[in-house]
């Protein structure tokens, strides 16, 4: 780990301004991903801005009847919140499917959204990786790619986004609230938050330099059956090969989003319109642009079967 300076700030505006003022600065809250990356010198911030004291740890009901989740709400607290468990069960279940209890106690809402890929080539500084070192190449393209993306890929990167929480939040039409160094606030839908890899996979989100996430807002809850199904190599502390988040109504309508298959939570609204036609029709829409490698083609069949299993469960409990 390389040397860095450290400061604590008192307001979100102060945090954003400090991040803009100091080149190479990073925000730190739970640190569950950032500290690992710093130890490996994948992330080498010159300055850490501790945002834990900003009071962004509340869950509040909005005037519209939704929820406003502070950026610093810990994953454990969010999953256990009475309103989340009752009205946004898919989110609670996704959170509990991720990481371990110890990590959930420390990890924050904003940090979960911003966590980096777990591609082994990203973590190996001896390997080329366009996400870590732009222009160096992508070792995964011709390497071990069993866990990598099958949709939304480019010739520069085939890494997946690892978050379970983000998949559920995308299903729920979450909106990310931020503050810029100029003191302006922005609202970014989660649908627009993650950038496709294209030729610049190192630019992962829509955040501007120094911009700080302050909250995530959820619209009023949707009724129906909430399901989160995660398929992985072992029963705990493993990232998804494929995951499916779904909210299905008694009449068979609803919405679905997938994890483990792309650089972001994978949702195509046109697929929702196919739910009444069954899993095959939904799958065909979601994976029309699939571009798997020889090693991860199995994910396509796995995704189709997981979709079918989720829809069958929803029908059985309707």
From Swiss-Prot:
FAD binds at residues 26-34, 108, 164, 213, 230. [4Fe-4S] cluster binds at residues 119, 129, 138, 157. Keywords: 4Fe-4S, FAD, Flavoprotein, Iron, Iron-sulfur, Metal-binding, Oxidoreductase, Periplasm. Its EC number is 1.2.99.6. Signal peptide: none annotated. It catalyses: an aldehyde + A + H2O = a carboxylate + AH2 + H(+). One of its GO terms (molecular function) is FAD binding. The complex requires PaoD for activity. GO terms for biological process: catabolic process; cellular detoxification of aldehyde. Its cofactor is FAD; [4Fe-4S] cluster. GO terms for cellular component: outer membrane-bounded periplasmic space; oxidoreductase complex; periplasmic space. SUPFAM superfamilies: CO dehydrogenase flavoprotein C-terminal domain-like, FAD-binding/transporter-associated domain-like. It is found in: Periplasm. Its main location: periplasm. InterPro entries: CO_DH_flav_C, CO_DH_flav_C_dom_sf, Diverse_Substr_Oxidored, FAD-bd_PCMH, FAD-bd_PCMH-like_sf, FAD-bd_PCMH_sub1, FAD-bd_PCMH_sub2, Mopterin_DH_FAD-bd. Gene3D superfamilies: 3.30.465.10, CO dehydrogenase flavoprotein, C-terminal domain, Uridine Diphospho-n-acetylenolpyruvylglucosamine Reductase, domain 2. Residues 1-223 form the FAD-binding PCMH-type domain. The keyword 4Fe-4S applies. Heterotrimer composed of PaoA, PaoB and PaoC. Oxidizes aldehydes to the corresponding carboxylic acids with a preference for aromatic aldehydes. It might play a role in the detoxification of aldehydes to avoid cell damage. This is Aldehyde oxidoreductase FAD-binding subunit PaoB. The lineage of its organism: Bacteria, Pseudomonadati, Pseudomonadota, Gammaproteobacteria, Enterobacterales.
